[in-house]
């Protein structure tokens, strides 16, 4: 039987684009681990994705994961849009390159060994873990230490 793990995530951006951060909580039974990091120039969507990626990549064995995010972009992207993007060679319906393809590919890889149930939670609505992740993400965004090397400003 697979370990049952809960992951809660949030991303933040002070300006969009601008300094950003992510926060994630990984919970297995009574044990919790938190993750956060800040980036000098990024977007809110990239930080939402990074939160999920980092937490999923921290899992060392296949797990049954319930991942809660307040990002419809992440949830819809990974459960619905990604299938056609892959069929089209990472292009959108109007033949444009998929934005944040580096992170979509990384997220796609990160979920392969797990059974993931994606849950959407309303942000800033008193969901305790989402609020904690929001604080982690905002604190990280306020003190960015890394460059988001995959971020490509739109020209």
From Swiss-Prot:
Enzyme Commission number(s) from the entry: 3.1.26.4
Record has Cytoplasm as a keyword: yes
Catalytic activity: Endonucleolytic cleavage to 5'-phosphomonoester
Cofactor(s) required, per the database record: Mg(2+)
Binding residue positions for Mg(2+) 1: 10, 48, 70
Family the entry assigns: Belongs to the RNase H family.
Protein name: Ribonuclease H
Species name: Serratia proteamaculans (strain 568)
Taxon lineage: Bacteria, Pseudomonadati, Pseudomonadota, Gammaproteobacteria, Enterobacterales
The gene coding this protein: rnhA
């Amino acid at each position: 039987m697979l370990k049952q793990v809960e992951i809660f995530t949030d991303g933040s951006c002070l300006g969009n684009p601008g300094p950003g951060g992510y926060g994630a909580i990984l919970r297995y039974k009574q044990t919790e681990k938190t993750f956060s990091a800040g980036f000098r120039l990024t977007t809110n969507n990239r930080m939402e994705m990074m939160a999920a990626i980092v937490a999923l990549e921290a899992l060392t064995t296949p797990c049954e994961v319930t991942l809660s995010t307040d990002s419809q972009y992440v949830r819809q992207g990974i459960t619905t849009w990604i299938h056609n993007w892959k069929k089209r060679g990472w292009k959108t319906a109007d033949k444009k390159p998929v934005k944040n393809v580096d992170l979509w590919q990384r997220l796609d890889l990160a979920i392969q060994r797990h059974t993931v149930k994606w849950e959407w939670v309303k942000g800033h609505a008193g969901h305790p873990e989402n609020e904690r992740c929001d604080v982690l993400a905002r604190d990280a965004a306020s003190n960015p230490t890394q460059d988001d090397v995959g971020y490509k400003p739109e020209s």
